[in-house]
Amino acid sequence: MESLTLQPIARVDGTINLPGSKSVSNRALLLAALAHGKTVLTNLLDSDDVRHMLNALTALGVSYTLSADRTRCEIIGNGGPLHAEGALELFLGNAGTAMRPLAAALCLGSNDIVLTGEPRMKERPIGHLVDALRLGGAKITYLEQENYPPLRLQGGFTGGNVDVDGSVSSQFLTALLMTAPLAPEDTVIRIKGDLVSKPYIDITLNLMKTFGVEIENQHYQQFVVKGGQSYQSPGTYLVEGDASSASYFLAAAAIKGGTVKVTGIGRNSMQGDIRFADVLEKMGATICWGDDYISCTRGELNAIDMDMNHIPDAAMTIATAALFAKGTTTLRNIYNWRVKETDRLFAMATELRKVGAEVEEGHDYIRITPPEKLNFAEIATYNDHRMAMCFSLVALSDTPVTILDPKCTAKTFPDYFEQLARISQAA
C-alpha cells in the first residue's frame, strides 16, 4: 500500500484558494441537468465524487463540455426528468452526493435503472429514502441487502404525502426536495426524528432557489413542494469553495500559525461548515471574516465540550486538533459519523489511540484527552478522504506521521498534501 510520511512542521503561513464544494458541485450538476437552458458552472470541484456524477449524467444522455482543468462545465439542460433509453446500470463509487439525489430523481417518469457502487457504498444505508419514495409511488427493488444499495429503480414517483426519517442523513431529504418539484402532484414531506446536518438542507434550498424553484419550509418539520414545476438555468453559477476542506488549513493555523487565509468562502457562505471557524475561536484561535475569505491565527488552544450535529464533517478536524488543546475535548451528537465513508467514530477513536491519546468512543460521541507527547504512528485511512486529511495535522507536533493510502483524498481534494506543503515550514 502506498504511504506518505509527513515530517514535523514548525509553522504554517499563507493563503489557500479552496477547490469547489463537493456538496454544492454535485447538487448544481444535477439541477443544471434537470433545468431548461444552458448552465455554466465555474469553480466546479474536480474529484472522484464529481466524476461519478458526471459519468452518470453522460450515461443518461445529458450533454456537457468540461474545461481542460475540469473546473468549468457547460451543461445543456434536459428541461425535465432524466430518462434512460432502455435498461441501464450506473456505478457511483462511494459518492453519497451522487447516489442519494439520483436515486430520487431517476424515480420520476418511467425508467429501468440500477444504481450500484463500491463495497462500502453497499454498507451505507438508503432505506429511509427508499421508504419515502415508495410512499410517493416509486417502484424500487433492493438487489442485495434490504435497506442498502444496489437499487433497481422503475419510476413511478408522483408526489403526495411522504414521511422521511431525518435522523441518519440529511441527504435523504435533499434528494426528495430536489425531485419533488418535477413530480406531477404536490408533495408534502414530513420529517420524522431529529433532522441531522440541517445546514446541508439550507444548501439544497439555496440552490433550488437559484434554479428558480422555491418551496415552503415549515420550521424544518414539514416541507410543501408544488408539483409540475420546472428548473430554469441561472446562466452562470459560481461554486463556493469547500468549507469542509477549509477546516484542515484553519486548524493548522490555530495549532502552528502564523496566519492562514482560505479564499472562496466567507461570512456569507451558504455552507454550514464555515461555523467550524467559530469552534476554533472558542478553543482560543483568532478568526477574521471577509466576504470571500476566512483567516485564522494561532492561539493557546483549550479543550471544548460541544454538540457537533450541525457540522459533522468539519467536526472530525476538531477531533485531531484536540491533540493540541489543553484538557479533554468532547464532541457530541455525531452518530451520523458512523454512516459516512467509513464508520468514522470507530476509525477516529482507533487512530487517535495510536498516536497516544486517551479516547472514549460512545454511541454518538467521542472524548479525547491528548498525551504529553504524540507517538509516531502509521495511520490507516479506511478509504476515507477526511481521515487522511485530519491526521496530517499530527505533523504539526515534533513527531512525524505516516498516512497510508494518501491518494484517498481524491474524493474531494486531490492535491491536498501539495497545498499543505506549500504553507508549511519544516521543523
Swiss-Prot record:
Annotated metabolic or biological route of this protein: Metabolic intermediate biosynthesis; chorismate biosynthesis; chorismate from D-erythrose 4-phosphate and phosphoenolpyruvate: step 6/7
Consequence recorded when altering T97I: This mutant is sensitive to glyphosate and causes a substantial decrease in the affinity for PEP. Is insensitive to glyphosate but maintains high affinity for PEP
Annotated effect of mutating G96A: Insensitive to glyphosate with unaltered affinity for its first substrate S3P, but displays a 30-fold lower affinity for its second substrate PEP
Effect on the protein of changing P101L: Displays a 2-fold lower affinity binding for both S3P and PEP. Decreases the binding affinity of glyphosate, reducing the potency of this inhibitor
EC number, as in UniProt: 2.5.1.19
Coiled coil: none
Protein family: Belongs to the EPSP synthase family.
Subunit: Monomer.
Protein's name in the database: 3-phosphoshikimate 1-carboxyvinyltransferase
Originating organism: Escherichia coli (strain K12)
